[in-house]
């Protein structure tokens, strides 16, 4: 593969183009992996209710066709990136946006967090100017962290989800037998407060590197809590956390 300068637009810093190329590639790779790990949602066989946003009355073959179009378009993005074919990258990206939108419209269950995120990231990267696309993508990620944190700042999280996450992390780290007592509630709140800290750090240029580091650390903790040494969640949950 060449240096990537062939794909650089006039007046656009090379690092912005490289970042966008990396993002496109990661979306395609993780998108394919997530489709595979949740394949029952995307290639239904009639044993699970389909709840369309707009009822076209179409056959399940339409769902299958759109899902395969999504697979092929993401493969096209990867191939075109390696071969340095900007026009094919753009065409494949547009097809993936349309296919993913169609899949979601045909079944509300497909509006997974990762699918929603990937859809908007692709829109920004495909139709925005490089710098604006990266800024929009960053703000989307910050918004997800912020919303996730705020939604956890209530009694429900402290009483249910917080203890559940902490138990998974304790299992993974071999600390399940330790009695935490009254300190436990403050430990549970570390999850949303950590997300708020990451969101704030990612907004400011000076603290962005720290924000990225904190984000990586936070997702390692979540992978421990949710992974095979913790609560043994499904691959789709772990893959999305790994991407994020």
Give each language-model segment a name.
Residues 2-244:
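Alpha-helical membrane-anchoring segments
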């Amino acid at each position: 593969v060449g240096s990537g300068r062939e794909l650089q637009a006039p007046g656009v810093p090379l690092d912005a183009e490289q970042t966008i190329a990396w993002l496109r590639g990661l979306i395609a790779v993780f998108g394919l992996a997530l489709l595979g790990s949740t394949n029952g949602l995307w290639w239904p066989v009639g044993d699970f209710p389909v709840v369309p946003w707009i009822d076209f009355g179409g056959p399940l073959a339409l769902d299958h066709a759109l899902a395969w179009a999504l697979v092929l378009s993401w493969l096209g993005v990867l191939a075109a990136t390696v071969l340095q074919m900007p026009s094919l990258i753009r065409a494949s990206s547009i097809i993936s946006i349309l296919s993913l939108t169609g899949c979601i419209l045909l079944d509300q269950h497909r509006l997974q967090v990762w699918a929603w995120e990937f859809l908007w990231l692709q829109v920004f990267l495909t139709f925005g100017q490089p710098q604006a696309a990266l800024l929009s993508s960053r703000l989307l990620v910050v918004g997800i962290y912020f919303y996730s944190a705020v939604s956890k700042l209530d009694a429900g999280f402290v009483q249910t989800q917080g203890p559940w996450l902490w138990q998974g992390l304790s299992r993974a780290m071999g600390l399940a037998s330790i009695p935490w007592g009254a300190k436990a509630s403050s430990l549970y709140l570390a999850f949303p407060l950590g997300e708020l800290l990451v969101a704030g750090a990612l907004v400011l240029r000076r603290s962005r590197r720290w924000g990225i580091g904190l984000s990586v650390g936070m997702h390692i903790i979540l992978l421990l809590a949710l992974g095979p040494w913790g609560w043994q969640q499904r691959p789709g949950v772990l893959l999305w956390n790994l991407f994020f």
